[in-house]
């Protein structure tokens, strides 16, 4: 057992860009003066989510959706074992974490779509209310995700936040991924920037 690469560069950059852009979009949501900034951040969130879906299909081993497809019974079993202090260990996303990711992606897409609709005045006040509800629901899911990371990290004696920065976790060498091509670094960044620029041409 030793330190092995689990999270590739695009996954890590995409993750932290999503953290930043969602935070910016949320804290500027109620400010009329910062409305354009809010919309730009929202477009960036959308662009990053599009990239994440793509990377979930074409990315490296632990970034792919097929590596964290779990049944509800597996999630319940994992949570039960976690409560007993004997949770199973996954190098990639664990069963509970995988569901949080899927929910966050779906909520994120719904929030962005409703936000765009409200911005172009489709649906009127009703759509704006839907957007607000989805935004706060996503915030709640983010909080649950963070708590899950803390509990899982404590249970497995891992620094999961650090691993999402440097990409490394404890594991066997045969379980490591190959470093992704450096040019992939520009993909999540370009997605965020290009999506943000859309606000100025629509």
Residue positions per predicted region:
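Membrane-embedded alpha-helical bundles that constitute the cytochrome b-like, heme-associated redox core
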Residues: 1-202
């Amino acid at each position: 057992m030793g330190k092995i690469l689990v999270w590739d560069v695009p996954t890590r950059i995409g993750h932290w860009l999503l953290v930043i852009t969602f935070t910016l979009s949320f804290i500027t949501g109620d400010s009329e003066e910062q409305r354009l900034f809010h919309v730009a951040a929202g477009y960036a969130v959308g662009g990053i989510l599009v990239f994440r879906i793509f990377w979930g299909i074409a990315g490296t081993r632990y970034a792919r959706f097929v590596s964290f497809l779990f049944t509800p019974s597996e999630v319940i079993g994992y949570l039960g074992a976690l409560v007993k202090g004997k949770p199973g260990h996954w190098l990639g996303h664990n069963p509970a974490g995988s569901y949080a990711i899927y929910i966050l992606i779906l909520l994120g897409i719904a929030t962005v779509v409703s936000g765009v609709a409200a911005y172009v005045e489709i649906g009127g006040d009703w759509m704006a209310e839907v957007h607000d509800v989805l935004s706060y629901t996503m915030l709640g899911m983010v909080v649950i995700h963070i708590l899950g990371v803390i509990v899982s990290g404590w249970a497995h004696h891992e620094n999961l936040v650090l691993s999402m920065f440097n990409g490394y976790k404890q594991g066997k060498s045969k379980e490591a991924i190959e470093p992704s091509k450096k040019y992939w670094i520009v993909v999540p960044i370009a997605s965020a920037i290009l999506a943000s620029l859309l606000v100025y041409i629509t």
